[in-house]
């Protein structure tokens, strides 16, 4: 899969983790009815239309929680670096960076001649502003834990930024590739419709400008004429919000959209046989799980949480509900992440589940299982199947289905505010490192500060992860994550379900569509095949 966008032709930058391990100094070389797609438009004045399953909850890079929304924001906002298809750090708005021998100072050399879409210059002061904003404790940054080592940033000159860290942080530069670290125009924060806390119309340096957004219907972005890099083909890109997978598929087959993500998995084989469309079954780093409220009086007992894991036949759900589009988890993270090791197995064992529930005195307990609809592969259908297994084990389970923004509002609320006992969630790290995945199991990321929505904490895990935060030896760091994974697996803060595949389907007359290893589609430079 090609994940390096052609406009950048980035030079490779060795990973910070490797640099710190060697103690070297590194530097890098240089469904309403919006306009229907017009794939054969002359001069690139056509519209490319993409159907997605969820309505965005925020367009502020700092507030990102969801890869689909981040995909939209990426059309407008760029980052200092990106992760290429070989897992290497590549420059985007930063042409190079250096790491001091002690790992505490990072120096970035910025790309010159870049302007924001409001006409203001991209420079070192803008980078300092953005780094200070995403580390501001007064701003809610759900993925901000990755930048915990940030101490300060200084504009050395117009095109040089020096970042000081409080401790070595092997994952810090990789984290700067995530949309949460997207660089926005400081001037735009005070523009009409925006504020520091409520940033709704992003202004970045990307190839497209934010256009019109109608909640529940669509987002339109338009080509930025003064973009510094390669010009995209399409003048306009429309993201249509279509929660029902079958409706997305129908729109594609009727020629009303050019591309969809997450089609009905039951139709994958038929779509693959259809000469009018192309099917991309991309690998994903996303784990799907049932987050259990570990502060709930019933869920506090680890026997209950383990019982719920034994109660669910994950493989049967994958076979019969997901039509094979997933793999059962054997660790608290996907196998594609650095730090993964095979940890264990909760084989389907209804008798063991019932016994543990009886020992814990939890038979008959009432549980609300909250699920989004249209966000993940067969999410609502899977939740119903899981609820059936839990009822068979002796629990009183009700399923609540919600649109995604409302769902996020509930699961990201403080523990005192009517959180559900269980909710179906997916987590796809923005870079392939356990550092990002383990945010889900740290007390510092309990909502609303972060996305640790199970409110799980374990002092042993905290200690191991604190060591991993600063460990520069790759093998030692990997073992620390493996040790933490084993404890988490036994504690069972989640019902560990599966890693899903990421199906993308698009018009066969289109070329230039691919996927990244972190469950994002890459269609920025899509164009007619002929």
PLM segments and residue spans:
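Periplasmic binding protein-like
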Residues: 50-52, 119, 389-444, 478-480
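N-terminal lobe/hinge region of extracytoplasmic solute-binding protein
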Residues: 51-101, 132, 203-204
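Aromatic- and charge-enriched surface segment that lines or borders ligand/interaction sites
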Residues: 95-140, 156, 162, 298
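Surface-exposed binding/hinge segments that line
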Residues: 109, 145-188, 212
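Gly/Pro-rich hinge or "lid" segments in bacterial periplasmic/extracellular proteins
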Residues: 177-231, 236
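Ligand-site clamp/hinge motif
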Residues: 224-270
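Append "and occasionally in soluble cytosolic enzymes with long acidic Gly/Pro-rich linkers
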Residues: 300-388, 392-393, 457, 483
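Extracytoplasmic/peripheral linker and loop segments enriched in polar/acidic and small residues
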Residues: 396-406, 439-507, 530
